[in-house]
Amino acid sequence: MKRPLLAALGIALAARAAPIVFGYEHYGDAPVRIELAERWAQDPHLWRGYLESWQYGPLHLTLIGALVRLLGDRVVAARLLSLTGGLLGVWLLYRVAERERGLDAAFWAAVALAFSPLHIQASATGASEAVFLALFLGALLLALREQVILSAILLGAAGLVRYDGWLYVPLFGALLWLRQRNLARSVAFCAVAAAPALFWLWVNARFAGDALAPLRHIDRDHAMLARMAADSFGSLRARLQHLVYWPLAVCLVATPVFGLLGLLGSVRALRRLEPGWDLVAVAWLPAAYFTFRAAILLDFRPMARFTLVAASLSLVFAHEALARLRRPARALAVAAAAATPLALALMCWNRTGAIAEWARPIAPIGSLPPGIVEAARWVKANARSDDAILLDGSTYYLDIPLAFASGIPEEQWIRSAWKGDFEQRLARKTPTLAVLVVRGSLGDFTRERFDFRGLLFCAAQRFTYATVYRSCAPGHTR
């Protein structure tokens, strides 16, 4: 293995060491993914579509579940899978950039991805982005090497980790045709790559009664977020924000320095049709589609996690712009890129406020707002095995990581966010503990007492953003 590649991998591993040990599962729906995988691991079987895997790709859940069975620890299993995917992603991006733009471009692309705060977070939690990116880049490298069938298999697998992988099937087909001018091979590639998606659509039609059930769920969620943005900022401002969202997000995901250099290099390569220009098209055509939906149709709200492919492929072209800088400026640029993950971590770790909540989704370490972890620890330390715990839902979804971090068995929870079986669980068990969180639906977490359907709870421990209540002692008056 070449020394520059080893250096890039060493940087990547070092940057992920602390987050993988000290971070928390939160963004990328990591807690839910791990819980679903853990259920599957108890009884491995063919997923029954949306009824069991919800909106998540079944391959990612299966891989986590298999590692849970092998290792016995759900968090270790999920993080080991993500770390492997993260390091493979750095290695594969190096190989893609080396093939298209040379050794220097390969080194800087790999180093930039190693410093990417979002990629660090995805490599150190149970989220799916690092695994997806590794499969995507593996498929791309094989396609560039004209190993069409293997490339199609990997891209098909990527689409079963994250459904946005399906968008790249026709784009890869077009890429192969542009490079090889062999229509039959391009069509064969698309057929093989699309087969897993078609099978999964059939599974959903068979068991859920709707082939597109997972996609409809995702569309509903993003349409709701888009409406919330329009209501909050106004239609015009929301459209303008969505119009520039993708390039601005890339400048955060890839660090501001390398993100900007990658964008400049990508524009130059596309305008001059330099080697690799077609990779720019593969990276940015999906971005154009999502931008159209967000800015024109107002039915989609983009997230930084969606930009990881565009950011990674743009880094292939960062070296050209970096090479134009004088040596002191280059050193300063690299130092700024290395400092970006640390700065984002300091903005949100154990902090509250608007800046902390802005930084948290893209920071290198998975973090929770202060008080949520403490509340989870209190519940874990004080809940008895016969306690039934009522857990409030939250518009910030803080109930999900709180329950996950506590490690309390699922059967003890009565979670208001679980609309499907909330009433059934209440009918079976009377809650003896309750946890209210900020912006919850059941009650005000700042109050000393909490009345739920005639059951009176008294505050046992208060935290920032959450309060734990226990059933009031007999004879307690309101």
Range-by-range predicted roles:
Residues A7-L13, L113, L155, C190-A194, ...:
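Transmembrane alpha-helix segments characteristic
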Residues G28, Q55, A77-G85, W108-G138, ...:
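Multi-pass, polyprenyl lipid-linked donor-dependent membrane glycosyltransferases
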Residues A15, R185-G262, A287-F290, A343-N350:
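Membrane-lumen/periplasm interface segments of specific transmembrane helices
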Residues R145-I149, L155, Y168-A194, L201-W202, ...:
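Perimembrane helix-loop-helix junctions
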Residues G89-R95, A112-F115, V131-L150, L154, ...:
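Specific aromatic-rich, kink-prone transmembrane helix
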Residues P369, V373, R377-R415, A434-R439:
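Short periplasmic/luminal acceptor-recognition loop of GT-C membrane glycosyltransferases, typified by
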Residues A122-S123, E129, A158-V161, L167, ...:
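Hydrophobic/aromatic-rich transmembrane helices and adjacent perimembrane loops
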Residues L5-G10, I153, P170, C190-A194, ...:
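Signature aromatic-anchored transmembrane alpha helix within multi-pass, membrane-resident enzymes
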